[in-house]
């Protein structure tokens, strides 16, 4: 499997992504309004629990905007990981009847959640500006595209690995559920990296989600940029996991049609 397959079959990936997006909001009473409601409700919960009760502060910046963006990023990561893990099993009938690169299904799962994420980012930016925040042009130009790229890569590797694993081992879905519960607490979703003791902070950035969150928050709600060393660590781990996922997927895909 070669990386150029992603570009060669971009139209098929787009078709799968649009189909999944339509299914998500089909017959929903509030429709796409859920894209705004979910991060707002999540941010309210985080604000009450962490800012109100645990006294987590963001050095004069809007904690609500900080939490809203964190919840939006987390929602993208968790829902994409869950849907991507099941993408091959969900499309089992197509896999056995239609000849197309199997990598299309998990790749398409990376896209629908970006719509909800864009809404959360817009809301966080507006609220941050309204509360007197606002990032520099450099943070915006660098942090936004690099942060989004790191986020997508951070979830793409696990999606490829786990989607291939679920075909053969159906209890892989239970691993995803447990893993996400653990990851939520060890990721700076509702708290800033400074909340973690300095001696342990380097371990925080072994998690690529921490690097992506740091870049996106610096770009949109004007939090300090993480150090180059921290971002390099997160980026390196994300790329390594991506290639491990690609390798595992390539070795497993010949058995997909036979097992499903």
Give the residues covered by each predicted segment.
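Hydrophobic transmembrane alpha-helices and immediately adjacent juxtamembrane helices
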Residues: 1-260
């Amino acid at each position: 499997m070669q990386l150029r397959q992603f570009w060669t079959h971009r139209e098929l990936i787009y078709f799968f992504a649009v189909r999944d997006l339509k299914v998500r909001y089909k017959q929903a009473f509030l429709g796409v309004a859920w894209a705004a409601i979910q991060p707002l409700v999540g941010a309210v919960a985080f604000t009450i629990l962490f800012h109100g009760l645990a006294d987590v502060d963001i050095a004069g910046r809007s904690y609500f905007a900080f939490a809203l963006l964190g919840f939006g990023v987390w929602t993208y990561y968790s829902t994409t990981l869950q849907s991507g893990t099941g993408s091959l099993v969900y499309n089992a009938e197509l896999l056995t009847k239609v000849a197309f690169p199997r990598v299309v299904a998990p790749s398409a799962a990376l896209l629908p959640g970006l719509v909800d994420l864009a809404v959360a980012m817009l809301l966080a930016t507006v609220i941050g500006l309204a509360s007197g925040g606002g990032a520099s042009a450099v943070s915006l130009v660098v942090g936004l595209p690099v942060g989004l790229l790191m986020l997508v890569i951070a979830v793409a590797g696990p999606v490829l690995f786990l989607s291939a694993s679920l075909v053969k081992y159906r209890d892989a879905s239970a691993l995803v559920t447990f893993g996400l519960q653990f990851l939520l607490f060890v990721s700076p979703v509702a708290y800033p990296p400074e909340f973690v003791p300095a001696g342990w902070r380097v371990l925080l950035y072994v998690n690529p989600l921490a690097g992506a969150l740091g870049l996106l928050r610096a770009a949109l709600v004007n939090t300090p940029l993480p150090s180059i060393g921290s971002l390099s660590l997160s980026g390196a781990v994300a790329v390594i996991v991506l290639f491990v996922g690609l390798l595992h997927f390539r070795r497993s895909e010949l058995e997909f049609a036979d097992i499903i």
